[in-house]
UniProtKB/Swiss-Prot annotation:
UniProt lineage: Bacteria, Pseudomonadati, Pseudomonadota, Betaproteobacteria, Burkholderiales
Name of the protein described by the UniProt record: Chromosomal replication initiator protein DnaA
Assembly and binders: Oligomerizes as a right-handed, spiral filament on DNA at oriC.
Family matches, as SUPFAM superfamilies: P-loop containing nucleoside triphosphate hydrolases, TrpR-like
Family: Belongs to the DnaA family.
Subcellular locations according to the entry: Cytoplasm
Annotated region (Domain I, interacts with DnaA modulators), positions in chain: 1-71
Keywords: ATP-binding, Cytoplasm, DNA replication, DNA-binding, Lipid-binding, Nucleotide-binding
Superkingdom per UniProt: Bacteria
Organism: Bordetella pertussis (strain Tohama I / ATCC BAA-589 / NCTC 13251)
Notes concerning its domains: Domain I is involved in oligomerization and binding regulators, domain II is flexibile and of varying length in different bacteria, domain III forms the AAA+ region, while domain IV binds dsDNA.
Length: 469
């Protein structure tokens, strides 16, 4: 039984996304296999997970069990301690090789996120039924501070009144600031409310893939039927729609259909809607019609709170001075903080350090600290701005002048003048040998634009906070 379950989980790991494995498969506990009746009993930790697994994964598990036990097997799901039947001794099956093609076919039937060949509404629903929500991302474990309190308040309002308050809700900000956490929290809150809502979380890249496969299989009717029937659609990183005209067209139709039915749409992006490049103006107009909220890099107190909460979830006591030390030196985003904490915990375990101290942190993070302790340099500004605008650092020095390069270059020159002691000629030299008058023009242009354009002012604020901490 143990050997079978390990094989079952291993096989599902090859076919399902990691978040589905951690959210739905790993919490399951195999109880017993009744060899006489060919019944496999499996326990789920709560009613919500039980119903979800029974609906979405039972046939995969049955297919794997049938291959293993070499006979049709019925899988029953129950809550711990609810069965009046005695525990059945685990039969020791004859280990056999699991037939990969049969299992893969069964798993793909339920896990393939793209539309199948057109058949019926039921066939489309089998493919699309799963929400792909990460149940670990909730409002309860979302750390709130000045940087994200408005976004969290808006998210709570949407979760309580979907389709009526702020539709669409557009969240934007840099990498690792909690946008994905918030939209999963909204979905989980709506599912937990028990209203039977149809929810779908999808990264923009996956949506593009769905459109391509629907086009290849001539399955757009099934595709539209599914997406237009949702109660809540969560689209992550919509900037990846850039230049994908067919995808944008299909999303526009889905957007219009859902909003007309007062169904909720939530979108995340790394930039303000009007700054999205390669996106149809009709979509940008729709994005602006709802509520747009920025999430900024966390301030010091929030970074400390994030570290303390994460350490608590790992079951590791962390003195506040240790959290403060890490937060003081690592400033950019939540993901960086969590990565640093994992590094500290791994270092402490490897070296047998039972208590976390500042000295342990200094040793574990010496490579990161050597970088973060340095003064702000023009080179650091160029890299940070290039990363933000998704261009190459080399574009900062090049003679090319397209708009998608000229603006970031001028922003970097402006920040170099504001945040370093370099003279205009020195800054010009570091930007490919440009004349000091070019730098002065860029500084004046960005300074004037900042006073007039809220979006640019926000971008500069984020970049300054990232660079200064």
């Amino acid at each position: 039984m143990k050997e079978f379950w390990q094989t079952c989980v291993s096989r599902l790991e090859q076919e399902l996304p990691p978040q589905q494995i951690s959210a739905w498969i790993r919490p399951l506990v195999p109880l017993a296999y009744d060899e006489a009746q060919a019944v496999l009993r499996v326990a789920a930790p709560n009613r919500f997970k039980l119903d979800w697994v029974r609906k979405n994964f039972s046939h995969q598990i049955e297919a794997l069990a049938a291959e293993w036990y070499q006979r049709p097997v019925q899988v029953t799901f129950e809550l711990p301690g609810t069965s009046s039947a005695p525990r059945i001794p685990m039969a020791v099956p004859r280990p056999v090789a699991v037939s990969v093609p049969a299992v893969v076919a069964a798993v793909q039937q339920a896990s393939e996120p793209a539309p199948p060949a057109p058949a019926s509404a039921d066939a489309a629903n089998i493919v699309y039924e799963r929400s792909r929500l990460n149940t670990d991302l909730t409002f309860e474990n979302f750390v709130t501070g000045k940087a994200n309190q408005l976004a969290r308040a808006a998210a709570l309002q949407v979760a309580e009144n979907p389709g009526t308050s702020y539709n669409p809700l557009f969240l934007y900000g840099g990498v690792g600031l909690g946008k994905t956490h918030l939209i999963h929290a909204i979905g989980n809150a709506m599912v937990a409310a028990g209203t039977g809502v149809r929810v779908r979380y999808v990264h923009a890249d996956q949506y593009v893939s769905d459109v391509v496969k629907a086009y290849q299989r001539k399955a757009f009717d099934d595709f539209k039927r599914y997406y237009h029937s949702l109660d809540l659609l969560l689209i992550d990183d919509i900037q990846f729609f850039s230049g994908k005209n067919r995808t944008q067209e299909e999303f526009f139709y889905a957007f219009e259909a859902m909003v007309a039915q007062r169904k909720q749409i939530i979108i995340t992006s790394d930039t303000y809607p009007k700054e999205l490049s390669g996106i149809d103006s009709r979509l940008i107009s729709r994005f602006d019609s709802g509520l747009t909220v920025a999430i900024e890099p966390p301030e010091l107190e929030m970074r400390v709170a994030i570290l303390l909460r994460k350490a608590e979830s790992e079951g590791v006591p962390m003195p506040e001075e240790v959290a403060f030390f890490i937060a003081k030196h690592l400033r950019s985003n939540v993901r960086e903080l969590e990565g640093a904490l994992r590094k500290v915990l791994a270092y402490a375990r490897f070296h047998g350090r039972d208590v976390l101290t500042v000295d342990v942190c200094k040793e574990a993070l010496k490579d990161l600290l050597s970088v973060s302790n340095g003064q702000i340099t023009v080179e650091n500004i160029q890299k940070t701005v290039a990363d933000f605008y998704k261009i190459k650092v080399a574009d900062m020095y090049s003679k090319r002048r397209p708009a998608n390069i000229a603006l970031p270059r001028q922003v970097a020159m402006y920040l170099a003048k504001e945040l370093t002691q370099k003279s205009l000629p020195e800054i010009g030299d570091l930007f490919g040998g440009r004349d000091h008058t070019t730098v002065l023009h860029a500084v004046r242009k960005i300074s004037d634009a900042r006073a007039k354009q809220a979006e640019l002012n926000h971008t500069l604020h984020v970049l300054e906070q990232t660079l200064k901490g």
